[in-house]
Swiss-Prot record:
It catalyses: 7-aminomethyl-7-carbaguanosine(34) in tRNA + S-adenosyl-L-methionine = epoxyqueuosine(34) in tRNA + adenine + L-methionine + 2 H(+). Monomer. PANTHER family: S-ADENOSYLMETHIONINE:TRNA RIBOSYLTRANSFERASE-ISOMERASE. InterPro entries: QueA, QueA_dom1, QueA_dom2, QueA_sf. Disulfide bonds: none annotated. Transfers and isomerizes the ribose moiety from AdoMet to the 7-aminomethyl group of 7-deazaguanine (preQ1-tRNA) to give epoxyqueuosine (oQ-tRNA). NCBIfam families: PRK00147.1, queA. GO terms for biological process: queuosine biosynthetic process; tRNA wobble guanine modification. It comes from Nitrosospira multiformis (strain ATCC 25196 / NCIMB 11849 / C 71). Belongs to the QueA family. One of its GO terms (molecular function) is S-adenosylmethionine:tRNA ribosyltransferase-isomerase activity. This is S-adenosylmethionine:tRNA ribosyltransferase-isomerase. Pathway: tRNA modification; tRNA-queuosine biosynthesis. Its EC number is 2.4.99.17.
Length: 356
């Protein structure tokens, strides 16, 4: 398919610059992927689509304060965005400066941290932090929250709370798994009382999630890699639910990618499916899984997501899940009805199973 198949015009005023006043006070567009039918709902209506024994899978990654400002050893200004912490003193990072720094050069960040540029690979730099404290501790102390590039306002103190899910537990992401931002403790408690099973995966969202696809043929796109983890407990929850007729709802494209990566991981190793028809394996690793129309989903029955950028890999993923023409119609409807788009925007529920 061509990149033009995933392009659309979005009025700038529909890009949400702030979250809803209260978590969960968002609209939700429901798409029945089988019939193509659309319903305008509220996020508070989510429980009406679920039943006891269903599994909701959340991404429990936590956004780190990954952005640092400083100067180079030449005196020029520099901005560093940590993409991934490699060990206690090294990180993979993007650097914005008037000229690309060379290996061996120094950066002085936040007035307190000396950093050595070790090497460059695939557009990122490997940096060594010359400090007795570890990278994570330094980021927490001196870093800034990395809001998405389409948020055209300064970071506010409230963003440290609202650009983080209430269940965030494992630091490592440079972007929030934004479908999860709609959930508050009240909604989670309500779902538990209903008998809906809560499960977690971890996928540390990288900055590549915001990058548009720049090739004409999407098959030529090189997908960014992200670290993920799927526990044995989550795998068992999914297998049990499927065996009993339950459905699996992935909260966000990152949860879906982690589950499908784990399923691909199992398939590569010819793992047995325990007779329940679900081939998925626990484990940790890196994934560059690129989900486009024609992909055969192995685990997920329904997807809760936000509205995505034109020409993005995430729009391709939801088009694969909900159907290309269905998603086009849904996005046209969302624009007409003035839904709020992107990270702080409204939700979309896409069902591929009976009853959702």
């Amino acid at each position: 398919m061509k990149i033009q198949d995933f392009d659309f015009d979005l009025p700038p005023e529909l890009i949400a610059q702030f979250p809803a006043e209260k978590r969960g006070n968002s609209r939700m567009l429901h798409l029945d992927a089988t019939s193509g039918a659309l319903q305008d709902r509220m996020f508070a209506d989510l429980p009406s689509y679920l039943r006891p024994g269903d599994v909701i899978v959340f991404n429990d990654t936590r956004v780190i304060k990954a952005r640092l400002y400083g100067v180079r050893d030449t005196g020029g200004r520099v901005e560093v965005l940590v993409e991934r912490v490699l060990d206690s003193h090294c990180a993979l990072a993007a650097i914005r400066a008037s000229h690309s720094p060379k290996p061996g050069s120094k950066l002085f960040l936040a007035g307190a941290i000396e950093v050595t540029v070790l090497s460059r690979e695939h557009g990122f730099y490997i940096l060594q932090f010359e400090h007795e404290s570890g990278v994570m501790e330094l980021l927490e102390r001196y870093g800034n929250l990395p809001l998405p590039p389409y948020i055209s306002r300064p970071v506010e103190k409230s963003d440290e709370l609202r650009y983080q899910t209430v269940y965030a537990a494992r630091p490592g992401a440079v972007a929030a798994p934004t479908a999860g931002l709609h959930f508050d403790e009240h909604m989670l408690g309500l779902l538990r009382k209903m008998g809906v099973v809560m499960a977690h995966v971890t996928l540390h969202v990288g900055s590549g999630t915001f990058q548009p696809v720049r090739v004409e043929n999407i098959a030529d796109h090189r997908m960014h890699s992200e670290v993920f983890y799927v526990s044995a407990e989550t795998v068992e929850c999914i297998r049990h639910a499927k065996a009993e007729g339950g459905r699996v709802l992935a909260v966000g494209t990152t949860s879906l990618r982690a589950l499908e990566a784990a399923a691909a991981f199992a398939g590569e190793r010819a793992e047995a499916d325990n007779g329940d028809g679900v081939r998925i394996k626990c484990g940790a690793g890196e994934t560059d899984i690129f989900i486009t129309p024609g992909y055969q989903f192995r685990v997920v029955d329904c997807l809760l997501t936000n509205f995505h950028l034109p020409r993005s890999t995430l729009l391709m993923l939801v088009s694969a899940f909900g159907g290309v023409e269905n998603i086009r119609c849904a996005y046209r409807h969302a624009i007409k009805e003035r839904y709020r788009f992107f990270s702080f925007g409204d939700a979309m529920l896409i069902g591929r199973a009976e009853g959702i």
